[in-house]
A protein has these predicted regions:
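All-alpha prenyltransferase/terpene-synthase fold signal
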Residues: 1-160
């Protein structure tokens, strides 16, 4: 029964209501100024859905209740958005040597990002707030969560 539920989660999070849908909207809106709410939508579907799938499937397989799975999903959404905003920041503040991929690619491709909408400092504050939200949500779950807290902090404060 758990495996079937996990397959459903994976199908939903990777399909048109998840990563594929987010990528489609992202491509369709290239070269257009995207308002923040639409950018949030794209990021939540692309990066957020990927993390939600991984984390919720893990919770299901560990025997979490439906309520706990919903909590994990909210936490993963916050982590995913923070991760993507950090990616936007690194695209303009890092180097190709550090990142291992070309920098300023969003600007070259005329893509709207948190940095282009809000500036680097506000984007950094958004990352911090979202990671704090994720950690707060984490500690509403049962069990020892120190490792997961450290993992969240590493994911959203990474330099590559």
């Amino acid at each position: 029964q758990r495996v079937g539920k996990c397959i459903g989660i994976l199908a939903q999070k990777t399909g048109i209501y998840g990563m594929i849908g987010g990528q489609t909207v992202d491509v369709e809106l290239t070269d257009k100024l995207i308002p923040k709410d639409k950018l949030d939508f794209i990021y939540r579907l692309k990066t957020g859905a990927l993390l939600e799938a991984a984390m919720v499937i893990g919770a299901v397989m560990a025997g979490a209740s439906d309520e706990e799975c919903e909590t994990v999903e909210r936490m993963a959404a916050a982590i995913g958005l923070a991760f993507q905003i950090q990616d936007d920041i690194l695209d303009v503040t890092s180097s190709q040597e550090v990142l291992g991929k070309p920098v300023l690619s969003d600007e070259k491709n005329n893509k709207t990002t948190y940095v282009s909408l809000e500036g680097i400092e506000k984007a950094k504050r958004d990352v911090e707030k979202l990671s704090e939200t994720a950690v707060d949500i984490l500690y509403s779950l049962p069990g020892s969560n120190d490792f997961l807290e450290d993992l969240i902090k590493v994911l959203v404060s990474r330099e590559k």
